[in-house]
Amino acid sequence: MASKIRRDDEVIILAGKDKGKTGKVTKVLVEDGKVFVEGINLIKKHTKPVPQLQQPGGIVEKEAPLQVSNVAIVNSATGKADRVGFRIEDGKKVRFFKSNNELI
């Protein structure tokens, strides 16, 4: 099944502590319905040092996944959140913005 939100899409956060912020999708977990967005939903992970691998311990900031329902793709023409539709053009399934029928 085709995904409405894919890697490298510009998205806006609709709910949560980062509501209203925009960022680029870095990873999509299709089975879980989650996405990772660059610089959004940062958490602090406490790690122990691993002497065998020369890894220092400490507090590491990393991105946590967001539910795909809490993000919306940003229409580059309007700069606002938009919905995505699918249609067949020249035998290929393509995505388009529902507000202005522009291809993504």
From Swiss-Prot:
Highest taxon above the source species: Bacteria
Alphabetical UniProt keywords: Ribonucleoprotein, Ribosomal protein, RNA-binding, rRNA-binding
Any one annotated GO CC term: ribonucleoprotein complex
Gene Ontology biological process terms from the UniProt entry: translation
Record InterPro entries: KOW, Rib_uL2_dom2, Ribosomal_uL24, Ribosomal_uL24_CS, Ribosomal_uL24_KOW, Translation_prot_SH3-like_sf
One GO MF term attached to the UniProt entry: rRNA binding
Gene3D superfamilies membership: 2.30.30.30
HAMAP family tied to this protein: Ribosomal_uL24_B
Stated family: Belongs to the universal ribosomal protein uL24 family.
Purpose: One of two assembly initiator proteins, it binds directly to the 5'-end of the 23S rRNA, where it nucleates assembly of the 50S subunit. One of the proteins that surrounds the polypeptide exit tunnel on the outside of the subunit.
Subunit-level organization: Part of the 50S ribosomal subunit.
Protein name, UniProt field: Large ribosomal subunit protein uL24
Source organism of this protein record: Colwellia psychrerythraea (strain 34H / ATCC BAA-681)
Lineage of origin: Bacteria, Pseudomonadati, Pseudomonadota, Gammaproteobacteria, Alteromonadales
